[in-house]
Design a protein with these regions (language model features):
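ATP-dependent helicase/translocase motor core
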Residues: 1-65, 72-81, 148
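SF2 helicase/translocase NTPase motor core
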Residues: 23-37, 41, 71-73, 82-148
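Short, charged/polar low-complexity linear motifs in solvent-exposed/disordered segments
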Residues: 65-66, 87
């Protein structure tokens, strides 16, 4: 006969109690995500592939051709990471940051792209070459970031 500690019994009871109440990522995507319904099927497949690769290898790159919706797949990933309370850092070319990413984040994911409190930081890739306080700032950001 196996002996269980009171903690083991308590944790098992809680796990059983909340087993059907815990929302999986797929349920969230289908029912609550802002971005998921906007994606075309091939973009959803790209998103799922990225998540699968990132979980397996600790990271992934989205390298699709022009016009295939990398921005929207990226927004979906940012939304999911925000839901998971991850600290996300996004680097984009300056023109894409100002002309695409900042406006799309404000439009589609305003709760994640806050100015006062946010787990999302967006930079131009040229910021990486800046001097002064920037190298130390990026060092701190790299220590805090869960996703870059």
């Amino acid at each position: 006969m196996e002996t269980w500690s009171p903690f083991d019994i308590y944790s098992h009871a809680l796990r059983e109690l909340f087993r059907d109440r815990e929302e999986s990522a797929n349920v969230w995507e289908e029912n609550e995500s802002i971005m998921f319904p906007i994606l075309d099927q091939y973009q959803k497949e790209a998103y799922w592939s990225l998540v699968k690769i990132a979980n397996r290898f600790g990271g992934a790159f989205l390298c699709d051709g022009v016009g295939l919706g990398k921005t929207f797949v990226g927004l979906m990933l940012v939304e999911r990471m925000g839901r998971e309370k991850k600290h996300v850092v996004l680097f984009a070319p300056k023109g894409a940051k100002e002309g695409v990413w900042d406006p799309k984040l404000r439009e589609l994911l305003p709760d994640l792209f806050g100015t006062d409190f946010s787990n999302l930081a967006v930079f131009s890739h040229t910021d990486l070459n800046r001097e002064g306080e920037w190298p130390e700032r990026f060092k701190r950001i790299a220590e805090i970031a869960d996703v870059i």
